[in-house]
Amino acid sequence: MKKPKIFLALDTNKISEAKRIIAYGKSSKLDIGYKFGLEFFYAKGSREFISKVKGKKIFLDLKLNDIPATCSAAIRSLKDIKNINYITLHANAGEETIKAVVKSAKKTNSKIRLLLVTVLTSISNSSIKKIGHTKSIKELVKKQALLAKACGCHGIVCAGTDLKSVKKIFKGEIVTPAIRLKGDSAGDQKRVIGPKEAFKNGSTALVMGRSITKGNIKKNISRLIKELK
């Protein structure tokens, strides 16, 4: 049986905190990798630090969202970080950009797997209408999943609340953020889900930040393992 795949979100701009999370974020019962987002990537020394992380899957969550030439060039500029396994780009960038990034990634580093970010987990149905969308989040995410498939992305990033409908039409990797352990606050997230339910509904990997990295990491990982049983 495969170990549950968990990406710990290193949501910090301090290398010392990243080291703490990596040092304590271990378990023989989980397949743990590390997600580096914009906050860490913009910090001094981040590229060198990321390039030296060994033995774990590296997920670079940049959510690229620009014109084709710019996003393609951004991928090429990452060629010195050879241990990257996943990079995200945003569905809002559009078909031309997505296809250009897929092409650029193949040339730059063939082991990079591209994940298309669908509707952010901090967005609700009411807030999505304010930015001009007339469809429900579920319908929009389904269209974005089909776009990912058509453009050659390896997977998508999708809220747990949309998993059931997406799983029927998308067979690639589905990474789910906004995961909360029982009793934990949702914080700024609007569409959260528990880890066991996420895997049950079709997620292939989870991104977990605050529920694991805040406080006693070892104890929080034990809580996660218990919930997954």
Feature map (PLM): residue ranges:
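N-terminal glycine-rich anion-binding loop in soluble enzyme alpha/beta folds
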Residues: 1-27
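Conserved anion-binding
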Residues: 2-4, 70-155, 159-164, 171, ...
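Hydrophobic faces of well-ordered beta-strands that scaffold small-molecule active sites
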Residues: 5-10, 32-36, 58-62, 85-89, ...
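Active-site-adjacent beta->alpha loops and helix N-cap segments on the catalytic face
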Residues: 15-20, 40-54, 66-73, 91-113, ...
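Structural motif
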Residues: 28-29, 81-82, 151, 201-202
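Charged helix-capping and loop-helix junction motifs
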Residues: 47, 72-73, 138-142, 188-196
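Glycine-rich phosphate-binding active-site loops on the catalytic face of alpha/beta enzymes
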Residues: 84-94, 181, 191-221
